[in-house]
Amino acid sequence: MPVRTLFPESWLWRKFTLPKSKSGISHYPISVKVPDSITTWQFVVVSLKAGQGLCVSDPFELTVMKSFFVDLKLPSSVIRNEQVQIQAMLYNFRDRQAKVRVEFPHKETLCSASKPGAPSHQAGVQIQQTSYSIVLEPQGQTQTKLVPRQEFLNMVPDTEAEVFISVQGYTQMLTHRSSDGTYHTSKGNPGSTWLTSYVFRVFALAYSMMTTQVLSLSSLCDMANWIIIDRQAEDGHFLEKGPVVMTSMQDGYQGSEEDVSLTALVLIALNEGKELCRQKNLMASIERARGFLERKLPDIQTTFAVAIASYALALANSSQANDCLDSFASPSGCGMLLNQPQSWSGEGVISNPAMCYSSLSVS
């Protein structure tokens, strides 16, 4: 039987130009050889067209299987003279039973019962042991090194992917922290709503992934508490009182109905950390922000604002999440094709963040 060795988690990444078609529907046949994984693959096509935007197709599923195959359960590593057990599991999906013989191939470098002739055994010899006492007096302070989780072993397709996050620059980030727990763009400036919510979102995501907790949960939740108490208005939207140094860092929400876009950004961050910070005012704040966006949604005019508001409402489980986004889609029936230009950096193009938020809101 052929040996299966190719087990990628993703593999089909191709870029091609669709031919023109009078009917408006183009076809591009391709022939590929699927990997050795016995699983179900999902294919999604993303297309771009000048002057129109982004189109995402519905997922197409392809099931790969073999009627009969052998699965060897091998250890992840073996050292010299170690005794290991190799188990062979046979899978038969045929309509009839099969009588087979599983034989381990003989190798000179391996000591196995499959070796022809009398089996050998390992001899023992006496070992002289000498002990020394050593006093260690380490200099300096204790140093800690964080090692991210590494659980790649036994990962196969159709298994929920592990999320691996490397958190760097935590101490440098603390230099932008004010005495009240907020974050500012430079010393002397008041806390920034956008920057504090962004830091809260990143740290909330990193908190659950750290093997050794270096992030204080109380300080993390204090950020959310400050945003809610100090920067949220009665109608649910969030205010920005800190100066904006680089508008390009803010995903392009400057000039895109800022009250809506900023509220959506903060709502996304609060949703990321709601499982960690369970204070009562957090869920009440999320409800007020969701209500504000739902009231504003029918009147939104800019592409970025409707994209990020739709994604924020989708995270908040709002039934109105895609009500306005559909009106920005192309009437050609494409999955998601934004047809309203968004001015960004002086060019009449749709910003990449707007495309990403649009795709996330319908995924």
Swiss-Prot record:
Segments passing through the bilayer: none
Domain of life: Eukaryota
SMART domains per record: A2M
One GO CC term, this protein: extracellular space
Disulfide bonds: none
InterPro entries found in the cross-reference section: A2M/Complement_sys (IPR050473), Alpha-macroglobulin_TED (IPR011626), Ig-like_fold (IPR013783), Macroglobln_a2 (IPR001599), Terpenoid_cyclase/PrenylTrfase (IPR008930)
Pfam families according to UniProt: A2M, TED_complement
Entry GO MF terms: endopeptidase inhibitor activity
Name of protein: Putative protein C3P1
Lineage: Eukaryota, Metazoa, Chordata, Craniata, Vertebrata
Gene assigned in the entry: C3P1
